[in-house]
Structures are given as C-alpha cells and as structure tokens.
Regions:
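Charged low-complexity intrinsically disordered patches
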Residues: 79-99
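Winged helix-turn-helix DNA-binding recognition segment
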Residues: 5-17, 22-77
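Long, low-complexity, charged/polar intrinsically disordered regions in eukaryotic proteins
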Residues: 1-3
Length: 99
C-alpha cells in the first residue's frame, strides 16, 4: 500500500483511516456501507460521508450495475491507494488490477 494518501492535508483522518482499512481487506470482500460500519464501529452515516470524500478525491469509484431484469444490483467498489485517474495514467484504463 502506498502511503501518499496518509500525508494529504486535504483528506480527513476519517477518510484516510477508512481507505487504509478498505485496502487491507481481502480482494473478495464484498464492500457495503453496512459492512464497513460494522467492522469499523462507526455509524453508517459516518461511513457514507467518508466514502463520498474518497470519491471526491478519486480514491474510490462506485458503480451500480443492473441485473438481467433491469434492477440495480449491489454497488461495485473500485479502490486504489493513489487517485484512480493517476493509476489509469500510469497503467492504462483497465480496472483489472484495482480492488
């Protein structure tokens, strides 16, 4: 894990801690606000605000695929220890190596 994000002054401690936690979870872990709140002993509201901040700074992207019958499925989280746009510039635009 690159620690550049831990030294950013424009990123809150809450967002830094949540990102560090998310990066340490197994690759097959199913991210959800409820699950992150449970393992971090934080409210779902606190987790939601930290996730929004991580999205704002491009460490997190959430997509909402649709099921075959058109319903919105669970969110798919893409996370990275550097802003995703920087990762894509270095490695191409494939999300394959991202969590």
């Amino acid at each position: 894990m690159d620690n550049e994000f831990l030294t950013r002054k424009d990123l809150s401690l809450k967002a830094k801690g949540l990102l560090a936690c998310m990066l340490c979870l197994p690759p097959d872990w199913r991210f959800s606000i409820e699950g992150l709140a449970y393992i971090n002993k934080e409210s779902e509201s606190a987790i939601s605000s930290a996730l929004r901040e991580l999205e704002q700074f491009d460490y997190l992207r959430r997509s909402y695929p649709r099921t075959e019958d058109g319903k919105i499925a669970n969110a798919v989280y893409t996370i990275c220890d550097i802003p995703i746009v920087e990762y894509e510039a270095l490695h191409g635009e494939s999300d394959d190596a991202l969590n």
